[in-house]
């Protein structure tokens, strides 16, 4: 797929194509072709840029949310799962440059790679197009996804909800325990398996590529079991 044609759909006319090529180059491709660059540095910058512009977007568009709710919503917006979904929706995988081995294993469909590329492209667009171009890009991709989907309602703090439920029932001794850590060398990621224990008894299990995500999923699992009607 032609890079310039792809971005013209988003009213972005590329000035420095080298920046965009760098943002789309996975380190496996860089190693095979002996390149001195990959998307990692731009990914670093893109992560910081997203934090800033997502914060601003949420602040001005969701005036009724508290500081804590905005913080949780921002974390959910910039997490890997959300960026992956957006990248997949716009077929970003078709542009990513991968090494042979990574391509064979369908790296162009991997959540970690697509999320990283979205961050790197965000940085490239900011450097090439300045703020106006970046706002145009985010408005048609990430922010559009947030507005059009049920994202806000689906974004919940299950740990806080569980804590409040237990307090209302005067139950205590809540613990989150890491049961397992699986390391994925090809993605340089750790998949955590966490359990929720109440008074020494396991009530829920969750997985995630961060401890926080795994704990949230475990809390969600626990809540679904605690709220399930008991048969008489």
UniProtKB/Swiss-Prot annotation:
Its cofactor is Mg(2+). Gene3D superfamilies: 3.30.160.20, Ribonuclease III domain (1.10.1520.10). It comes from the Bacteria. Residues 3-130 form the RNase III domain. One of its GO terms (biological process) is mRNA processing. PROSITE patterns: DS_RBD, RNASE_3_1, RNASE_3_2. GO terms for cellular component: cytoplasm. Its EC number is 3.1.26.3. Keywords: Cytoplasm, Endonuclease, Hydrolase, Magnesium, Metal-binding, mRNA processing, Nuclease, RNA-binding, rRNA processing, rRNA-binding, tRNA processing. It catalyses: Endonucleolytic cleavage to 5'-phosphomonoester. Mg(2+) binds at residues 43, 116, 119. The keyword rRNA-binding applies. It is found in: Cytoplasm. Residues 157-228 form the DRBM domain. One of its GO terms (molecular function) is rRNA binding. The active site is at residues 47, 119. HAMAP family: RNase_III. Homodimer. Digests double-stranded RNA. Involved in the processing of primary rRNA transcript to yield the immediate precursors to the large and small rRNAs (23S and 16S). Processes some mRNAs, and tRNAs when they are encoded in the rRNA operon. Processes pre-crRNA and tracrRNA of type II CRISPR loci if present in the organism. Belongs to the ribonuclease III family. This is Ribonuclease 3. It comes from Mycoplasma mycoides subsp. mycoides SC (strain CCUG 32753 / NCTC 10114 / PG1).
